[in-house]
């Protein structure tokens, strides 16, 4: 691989990982001691498959809204531009297993959802690009492989 880059994920050998997985991608400590924990939540195998944008977009909305019902430590859930996963960030919450539980509970909530939150032109920048059914399929697939989430390299 090339020289070390500033972006953590650019230093990850994407040919060596095996999706699905959840890995701690980085930590940051603020000037007042607060700590941010960023997780790579990988739904699809890099460079082999990806999430279709309407499903990914709806899953982002659903997870961003529903996860906050289970924790006040969530900072953000952001989709990856490569459409293979999300970044999930917490503040002052360094419990990996609990982060997995929050994710699992949130995805279970997605399966029960009857609408996509903020799926309108006032609250969303591309309201026409959503798929509740697609989001549910992604959540169901990821949950079905929960036993693999801790195994980043398929060992």
Curated annotation (Swiss-Prot):
Catalysed transformations (reactions): S-(5-deoxy-D-ribos-5-yl)-L-homocysteine = (S)-4,5-dihydroxypentane-2,3-dione + L-homocysteine
One Pfam family matching this protein: LuxS
Enzyme class of the recorded protein, top EC level: lyase
GO biological process, one term: quorum sensing
Bilayer-spanning residue ranges: none
EC assignment: 4.4.1.21
InterPro entries according to UniProt: LuxS_sf (IPR037005), Metalloenz_LuxS/M16 (IPR011249), S-ribosylhomocysteinase (IPR003815)
Binding site for Fe cation: 57, 61, 124
Example GO molecular function: iron ion binding
Coiled coil residues, start to end: none
Keyword Transmembrane attributed: no
Record text on cofactor binding: Binds 1 Fe cation per subunit.
The protein's required cofactors: Fe cation
Sorted UniProt keywords: Autoinducer synthesis, Iron, Lyase, Metal-binding, Quorum sensing
PANTHER family, per the entry: S-RIBOSYLHOMOCYSTEINE LYASE (PTHR35799:SF1)
Subunit structure as annotated in this protein's UniProt entry: Homodimer.
Biological role stated in the UniProt entry: Involved in the synthesis of autoinducer 2 (AI-2) which is secreted by bacteria and is used to communicate both the cell density and the metabolic potential of the environment. The regulation of gene expression in response to changes in cell density is called quorum sensing. Catalyzes the transformation of S-ribosylhomocysteine (RHC) to homocysteine (HC) and 4,5-dihydroxy-2,3-pentadione (DPD).
Family: Belongs to the LuxS family.
NCBIfam families in the record: PRK02260.1-4 (NF002604)
Protein name in the entry: S-ribosylhomocysteine lyase
Primary gene name: luxS
């Amino acid at each position: 691989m090339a020289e070390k880059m500033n972006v953590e994920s650019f230093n990850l050998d994407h040919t060596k990982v095996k999706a699905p997985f959840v890995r701690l991608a980085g930590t940051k400590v603020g000037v007042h001691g607060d700590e941010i924990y960023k997780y790579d939540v990988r739904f699809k195998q890099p460079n082999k498959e990806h999430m279709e944008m309407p499903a990914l977009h709806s899953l982002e909305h659903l997870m961003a809204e529903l996860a906050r019902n289970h924790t006040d430590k969530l900072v953000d859930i952001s989709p990856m531009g490569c459409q293979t996963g999300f970044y999930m960030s917490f503040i002052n919450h360094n419990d990996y297993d609990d982060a997995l539980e929050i994710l699992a509970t949130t995805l279970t909530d997605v399966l029960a959802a009857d609408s996509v939150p903020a799926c309108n032109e006032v609250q969303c920048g591309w309201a026409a690009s959503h798929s509740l059914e697609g989001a549910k399929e992604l959540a169901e697939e990821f949950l079905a492989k929960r036993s693999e989430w801790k195994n980043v390299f398929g060992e």
